[in-house]
């Protein structure tokens, strides 16, 4: 959803999940290593099987994984990547996500919410309701309007909810959500 240039940032490892910016079901972890990161994997003992990426790198050379992955999710990732390419590539996808985020954030300003961050990423907008439980907003939108937003758990359950901007969402979805939020105030 936002540009991430490992080389420019000097990052040696990037870890994400299939459910993040690709908007696929959860179940696949994606790890990208810089050449320096690969060297570190081969030259250091990870101490346990789960953090030892040597087998994953060796299997990757032959196009395989060391363990059976969630094949259905891999196929969905493949399909999603093809759709991103067909729609103009990663820059076009990032532009679409940014446009959705900007549109939503501009419209939600008139409602009784505070932005949790002054510089949020484009994938999600966290909001703090001023006078009602965040979890109650989540359940009302889900049960009465058939709209899903992202609830928080733990100490933040009643204080913050999140609105996502990735996947097959449109400006019309933003309009429907804003209208539902306005209707809930009546």
What are these regions (language model features)?
Residues 1-17:
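Conserved PLP phosphate-binding loop immediately N-terminal to the Schiff-base lysine helix
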Residues 21-106:
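Active-site C-terminal subdomain of aminotransferase-like
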Residues 87-97, 112-118, 152-154:
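Flexible, glycine/charged-enriched surface loops at secondary-structure junctions
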Residues 155, 159-186:
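PLP-dependent enzyme catalytic core of the Aspartate aminotransferase-like
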């Amino acid at each position: 959803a936002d540009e991430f240039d490992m080389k420019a940032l000097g990052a040696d490892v990037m870890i994400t999940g299939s459910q993040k910016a690709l908007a696929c079901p959860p179940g696949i972890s994606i790890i990208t290593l810089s050449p320096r990161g690969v060297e570190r994997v081969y030259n250091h003992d990870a101490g346990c099987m789960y953090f030892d990426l040597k087998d994953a790198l060796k299997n990757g050379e032959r196009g395989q994984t060391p363990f059976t992955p969630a094949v259905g999710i891999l196929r969905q990732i493949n399909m999603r990547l093809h759709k991103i390419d067909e729609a103009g590539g990663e820059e076009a996808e990032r532009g679409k996500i940014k446009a959705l985020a900007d549109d939503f954030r501009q419209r939600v300003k008139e409602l009784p919410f505070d932005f949790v961050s002054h510089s949020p990423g484009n994938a999600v907008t966290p909001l703090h309701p001023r006078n009602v439980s965040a979890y109650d907003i989540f359940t009302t939108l889900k049960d009465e309007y058939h709209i899903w937003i992202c609830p928080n758990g733990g100490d933040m359950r009643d204080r913050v909810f999140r609105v996502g901007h990735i996947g097959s969402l449109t400006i019309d979805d933003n309009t429907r959500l804003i209208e539902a939020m306005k209707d809930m105030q009546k």
